[in-house]
């Protein structure tokens, strides 16, 4: 039956749909960065910072969203420590590093731990830097719930 031999067979290089998807991806990658961002990216490369354009775009977007640069740095540091951990498990100092970042993201969003952790860290650091936060008064200076200074705290009846 000659009809079965028509079309791309298992020996062909790539199906036409896959090739079209590759071309779309290549076009999208070319337009990832704006002209200003491309200049920054080229400066980072000239300074010796080898980074993927997609990752660079994410970093620029985070900074545009007013995420604290320190939070972005700490997120990248923990992600890089995780990559080193996966490739070089014999380093004991690197093993203890990622465990310190786990409690920071535990009670937060259950979605992306890396991005959620960075946003939670940025949110926390922006709150800590706020001058509107007032220190709490120590509880020793407060009066007991029983009322005035003459009354004693509640006692059990005998």
Swiss-Prot record:
Residues 84-158 are annotated as: Disordered. The modification Phosphoserine is found at residues 34, 152. One of its GO terms (cellular component) is gamma-tubulin ring complex. InterPro entries: MOZART2. Coiled coil: none annotated. Keywords: Cytoplasm, Cytoskeleton, Phosphoprotein. Residues 111-122 have a biased composition (Low complexity). Residues 128-140 have a biased composition (Polar residues). It is found in: Cytoplasm, Cytoskeleton, Microtubule organizing center, Centrosome; Cytoplasm, Cytoskeleton, Spindle. Belongs to the MOZART2 family. Required for the recruitment and the assembly of the gamma-tubulin ring complex (gTuRC) at the centrosome. The gTuRC regulates the minus-end nucleation of alpha-beta tubulin heterodimers that grow into microtubule protafilaments, a critical step in centrosome duplication and spindle formation. Associates with the gamma-tubulin ring complex (gTuRC) consisting of TUBGCP2, TUBGCP3, TUBGCP4, TUBGCP5 and TUBGCP6 and gamma-tubulin TUBG1 or TUBG2; within the complex, interacts with TUBGCP2; the interaction plays a role in gTuRC activation. Interacts with TUBG1. This is Mitotic-spindle organizing protein 2B. The gene is MZT2B.
């Amino acid at each position: 039956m000659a009809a079965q031999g028509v079309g791309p067979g298992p020996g062909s290089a790539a199906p036409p749909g896959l090739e079209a998807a590759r071309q779309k991806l290549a076009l999208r990658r070319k337009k990832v960065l704006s002209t200003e961002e491309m200049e920054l990216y080229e400066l980072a490369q000239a300074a010796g910072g080898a980074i993927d354009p997609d990752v660079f775009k994410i970093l620029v977007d985070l900074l545009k969203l007013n995420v604290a640069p320190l939070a972005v740095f700490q997120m990248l540091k923990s992600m890089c420590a995780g990559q080193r951990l996966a490739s070089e498990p014999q380093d004991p100092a690197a093993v203890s590093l990622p465990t310190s970042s786990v409690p920071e993201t535990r009670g937060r969003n259950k979605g992306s731990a890396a991005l959620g952790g960075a946003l939670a860290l940025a949110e926390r650091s922006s709150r800590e830097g706020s001058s509107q936060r007032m220190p709490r008064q120590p509880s020793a200076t407060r009066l007991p719930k029983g009322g005035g200074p003459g009354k004693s705290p509640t006692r059990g009846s005998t």
